[in-house]
Amino acid sequence: MIYWIFLALAITAEVIGTLSMKYATVNGQITGHIVMYIMITASYILLSLAIKRVALGVAYALWEGIGILFITLFSVMWFDEPFSLTKLAGLAILVIGIVMLKSGTRKAQGDSGLKARQKERHHATV
């Protein structure tokens, strides 16, 4: 469960970092850039912790996909970026793809399965 929390925090940090970058660009303040660097760094660190137990493909798809979804929505609300039916359709397809990817992923075997496979590789056969 903690690894999913790491992933949620990574997504949140990515969204905050990216929005801070836009804020800094619009307002010309260095604070936005500093927040961006800190949050993007935190996002990658948290993502690396999350993929210890969450499948990489699922974690990355959720990290990027949900990040794109929230960044787009907040950009429309806060920075008056245009929104169209085409963007809405793209976001809907994105969400459908994430759901399909998540539902099609098997549960990880855990460390014991991985360690057993690694031991098999290191033993010589006679």
Curated annotation (Swiss-Prot):
Keyword tRNA processing part of the UniProt annotation: no
GO terms for biological process, alphabetical: glycine betaine transport
Cellular component aspect of the GO annotation: plasma membrane
Record NCBIfam families: PRK10452.1
Gene Ontology molecular functions: amino-acid betaine transmembrane transporter activity; antiporter activity; choline transmembrane transporter activity; spermidine transmembrane transporter activity
TM stretches of this protein: 1-21, 30-50, 54-74, 81-101
Pfam families on file: Multi_Drug_Res
Family in the record: Belongs to the drug/metabolite transporter (DMT) superfamily. Small multidrug resistance (SMR) (TC 2.A.7.1) family. MdtJ subfamily.
Summary of the function given for this chain in its UniProt record: Catalyzes the excretion of spermidine.
Record note on quaternary structure: Forms a complex with MdtI.
Protein name per Swiss-Prot or TrEMBL: Spermidine export protein MdtJ
UniProt subcellular location: Cell inner membrane
Domain of life: Bacteria
Keyword vocabulary terms for this entry: Cell inner membrane, Cell membrane, Membrane, Transmembrane, Transmembrane helix, Transport
Taxonomic source organism: Sodalis glossinidius (strain morsitans)
Membrane topology qualifier: Multi-pass membrane protein
